[in-house]
Curated annotation (Swiss-Prot):
Bias kind Basic residues: ranges: 317-329
InterPro entries noted in UniProt: UPF0158
Protein name in the entry: UPF0158 protein CT_429
Family stated for the protein in its record: Belongs to the UPF0158 family.
Location of the region described as Disordered in the Swiss-Prot/TrEMBL record: 292-329
Organism: Chlamydia trachomatis serovar D (strain ATCC VR-885 / DSM 19411 / UW-3/Cx)
Bias-annotated ranges (Acidic residues): 295-313
Highest rank taxon of the organism: Bacteria
Signal peptide stretch: none
Length: 329
C-alpha cells in the first residue's frame, strides 16, 4: 500500500468549485477529489489517448488517494426541481407551469429558461440551489471521512491562507500559522455537527427588502505541491468567486454561456408556441384523413387545393380594377 504525505491541518477546499464539479459530473466527464492535498481533476474524452492512459494508470495504482465525485441521476435532478417548485413558488399558475416543465423532455434546460423569465423566482432558486448543494457536498465529504474547511467560510487574510497551503506538510511552522491551524481544526468540527446537514431557520421578522448586493469572496491562489505530473493537465481550476456564477445547466459550463444562449436563441415561450402550432397542424391532417384524404398524396392535395382556390378568388378582383382604370382614361 502506498504511503502519502500527511497534511498538518484540515484541507482547504472551495465549496463553490465543488458545486461546479458536482453539477458538471456526467457520463462524459469524471471528476475526482484528492485526499492528500484537496485538488480536483477531471477526465473527459477530448484529451489525447496517451494522456488518458497515463491518468487511468495513476488512478489504478493510487485508487485509495482519489475519490470519484458522484454524478447526478435523472431522479435526483427531477427531485431538486420538484422540491424547489413545491417549497418556494407560491403563485398557482407559475407553479403549475413549472411542474409541467419538470415532467417534460429536456426538463433541466427548459426549467432554467423559464426560470430566467421570472426574476423573483430566479433569486429564490439561486439561494435554494446553493443551500441544497452545500448540504449534499458536506454529506459526501463526511461519508468519505475528509477533514476539511471551506475556504469561503474563513475570515483569514489571503497571505495566511497561502502560507497554510505552502506549509501544509511541514510539522514546524511559525506561531502565527500554528494558531491558524488550531482555528482550522476547530472550524472543521462544525461540518461534522448535526446543524451542518440541518441548518436552523433564522428566527424573527424577515428583513425589509432592499437592493441585493452580492459580495465576491476573497480567495487565495491555488498552491499544490504534491500533484502527480500526469494529473497536472487534468486539473479543474475555475475561478468562481460568487454563487451567481454557478449554473445548473448540463449543456453550458458557465452562467455567461447560458445567458448568451438565451439572448441569441429562441425563448422557451416561442418553442412552446411552435409546439402547439405543430399539434394543431397534426390535428388538421388527421381531420383531412377522416374526410377521405387518407393517402399522403391526397392529404397534400387537400391543402394545395385550398390554397389554389384562394388564388382563383383573388385573380378576378385584379382584372376588374384594371378595367376601371382604362375606362376613366
Amino acid at each position: 500500500m502506498t504511503t502519502y504525505p500527511v497534511p498538518q491541518n484540515p484541507l482547504l477546499l472551495r465549496v463553490l468549485r465543488l458545486m461546479d464539479a458536482f453539477s458538471k459530473s456526467d457520463d462524459e466527464r469524471d471528476f475526482y477529489l484528492d485526499r492528500v492535498e484537496g485538488f480536483i481533476f477531471y477526465i473527459d474524452l477530448d484529451k489525447d489517448q496517451e494522456d488518458l492512459d497515463k491518468i487511468y494508470q495513476e488512478l489504478e495504482e493510487n485508487a485509495d488517494r482519489y475519490c470519484l465525485i458522484p454524478k447526478l441521476t435523472f431522479y435526483e435532478i427531477k427531485k431538486i426541481m420538484e422540491t424547489f417548485v413545491n417549497e418556494k413558488i407560491y403563485d398557482i399558475d407559475t407553479k403549475e407551469k413549472f411542474l409541467e416543465i419538470v415532467q417534460s423532455k429536456n426538463a433541466r434546460e427548459q426549467f432554467l429558461e423559464f426560470l430566467y423569465d421570472h426574476e423573483t423566482e430566479q433569486e429564490k432558486w439561486q439561494q435554494f440551489y446553493v443551500e441544497r448543494s452545500r448540504i449534499r457536498i458536506i454529506e459526501w465529504l463526511r461519508n468519505n471521512q475528509f477533514q476539511f474547511v471551506f475556504e469561503e467560510d474563513l475570515d483569514f487574510s489571503k497571505h495566511i491562507l497561502e502560507q497554510l497551503k505552502v506549509h501544509l506538510f511541514d510539522a514546524k511552522v511559525s506561531k502565527e500559522l500554528t494558531q491558524a491551524r488550531q482555528l482550522l481544526l476547530n472550524k472543521s468540527k462544525v461540518y461534522y455537527s448535526n446543524e451542518a446537514l440541518n441548518p436552523r431557520p433564522k428566527r424573527g421578522r424577515p428583513p425589509k427588502q432592499s437592493a441585493k448586493v452580492e459580495a465576491e469572496t476573497t480567495i487565495s491562489s491555488d498552491i499544490y505541491t504534491k500533484v502527480p505530473s500526469v494529473a497536472r493537465r487534468f486539473l479543474f481550476l475555475p475561478e468562481i468567486t460568487s454563487p451567481s456564477s454557478l449554473t445548473f445547466s448540463e449543456k453550458f459550463d458557465t452562467e455567461e454561456e447560458f445567458l448568451a444562449h438565451l439572448r441569441g436563441g429562441g425563448r422557451l415561450e416561442d418553442q412552446l408556441n411552435l409546439a402547439k402550432f405543430s399539434e394543431r397542424f397534426d390535428s388538421l391532417r388527421e381531420l383531412s384523413a377522416k374526410l377521405g384524404y387518407d393517402s399522403d398524396g391526397e392529404t397534400g392535395d387537400f391543402f394545395d387545393e385550398e390554397y389554389d382556390d384562394e388564388e382563383e378568388e383573388i385573380k378576378p378582383k385584379k382584372t376588374t380594377k384594371r378595367g376601371r382604370k382604362k375606362s376613366r382614361s
